[in-house]
Amino acid sequence: MKEPAAPAPGAAASHRKNPLAAPAAIAACVIVFYWVPMTSPSASIQGDAADVHYPMQKYLSDRFSPRQFPFWTPYVLSGYPLLANPKVGAWYPPNWPFLLAGITPRSIQLELALNALLACLGAYLLISSHVENRMAAMLGAFAYGLSGFFAGHASQVSLFAAAAMFPWLLVAYRRAIDIAPVRYTAFGGLVGGALILAGSGQAAVSSFLGLGLYAFADWWRERQGWLRDVAIIGFMLAGALACAAIQLVPAQELARESSHAADSSPIVEGFLHPGSLMTLVAPDWLGAISGGIQAPSGAAQFYFYAGLLVLPLALMGAVKSGVRLPGLFLIVPPVWYMLGPAGGLYYLGSLAPGLRSLHAPVEGWFLAALGLAFLAAAGAEWIFAGWRFPFLPVLVAGLLFVDVWYWNSLGNPLAYVRASFDELYGSSEEAGRAEAIKQPQLTRFHAPANRVSMGPKLHPLDLKLEATYGASLLDPGPYRDYLDAMERNPKLRDGLNVGRFLNVATGRIDENASVLARAYFPKAVVDVRSLAESRQALETLDPAVKSLVLWPHAPIRQDPDAAAMGVRYGEQWYRVHYHAVSPSLLKLSVAWYPGWHADLDGQPLPIIRVDHALMGVIVPAGDNEVAFNFHSKRFGTGLAISLASGLVLVMCVRVGRPSHHRKRKKHRHSRRVTA
């Protein structure tokens, strides 16, 4: 087969004749692909999408106000800094229309569809910068944005959204190299910021590593310009981190306080098993479609099907196309690393802090998925160029779309559940509402999080049920210590203000007659010098008798008759009226966290740790009222950085001009196909 000639100037004009035709066709196909889960009353989200993302986003949407954001919620983990958790997706721009309109289970499905559209459009723009045939680029877009990775991770909304933004990161880099360095480097910073704000740190790390691999493919082919490439990537990364500071700064504080902060144990699951690669050609190989799941750690992680034509087309593209390098670099190193210790590269990669933090390496498969889509498009272009049958491109792209439409949507239980949200959670939510009504005011409900059936796992947010648990949340370490000790020392329930609890032995909900008030004065106070000492003391602590106070603190002469005579409260504040005849410790049974402030008549009172995980203040003698308020210490800093950097990047996008040193010649060569 002869090598096709480079396109003539007239051909380029023809290619640009209808620039919106392909994106419009892609949008129509995505709507068709998601039509059933978006509109059917017998389809719903499932897994973490229903249990975690929906309750968090609904909580945020219900409380959205320009003057007040729900930085703190009292309903999970005895108080929790909700907006510090990246999974909420509060600052991810594509989520904003849904948050403003009001979140329902259907809203989450619409978010998935929108992100799938972004994934397809980004892949199309990237691939079309390397191949001339628009139908080949559309085929590649379907092979990525509608691939098995997205079907298998439909319940992981943050990861899904971040993977959807990944092609746009590469598009920004490609255009920074080829067209306007300043404009598109700044655009890449904005895209990278959105990718981070999607809420998946693992996907963000993988994406920037993928960007590095894509750029390395450029250098490998040209063997020049590496300093320029590194500078562009560096500025894109810096811009992304700065734009995402509104989320990263509070999240860094939460991670530091987290029970997982000191966990450096090696990854023991989430590696790529070679047998799972069979799902590239046989979607039900692991039983994901039929329901007989045999995957090592669940079928969703190991479901890769992107169409029966993708693998042969990708092999054709790798052999025959002159644009094989970007695709191969996106496939080979990531897959090698995902194999884990068995592959060898994992040991080298684990030396890097970013890679070490990856929970499940196989969740970086979207890099390989884009590489396969890239090579499949290149292979398709080679075939279309050689076999000049007019309808062949439309036929092949259409066959691939119908293929993935069935296997990754209509017939795939990983993509959505075939039941309404009410059918899944309605009865348990009703039971939860009934229990929430019975809960005495200003007391908490305690149960092992995985043993409660009251709706989605984060049902306390929707039920407004103050609870000690919170599934799938990054919990502060001292609070986790307290809950662990409470399993061995039930008296700690009293100090945590637990009024009712699930009796695991009987399966019934019991009353706790000895519950202590939300705000009270302990009978006695004992100093502890370290968190390790207070953690050990929890094993025998009786909060009704005494409380532990972390040193240093102001002098205490505990008044045994001091009393908290009235408590007013909101979701992010408390007002406690008290009487004491000497400086005494007032304990507030709320999880300690940076950002809580207390003041008395406008004078600040230091917040101190009480009973290892809770908080309190030392109040002066008298008859006064103490005000407790939560204000995130880090949000203001992050907001200022994000606004300033975002403004600078937007200005750079607007004023950046095309470079006089664009490498058009290189890309005319890269678009060619070789015999």
Feature map (PLM): residue ranges:
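Conserved luminal/periplasmic juxtamembrane motif of membrane-embedded glycan-processing enzymes
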Residues: 2-578, 583-591, 668-670, 675
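Active-site-proximal, structured, solvent-exposed surfaces of multi-pass membrane proteins
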Residues: 14, 53-56, 545-666
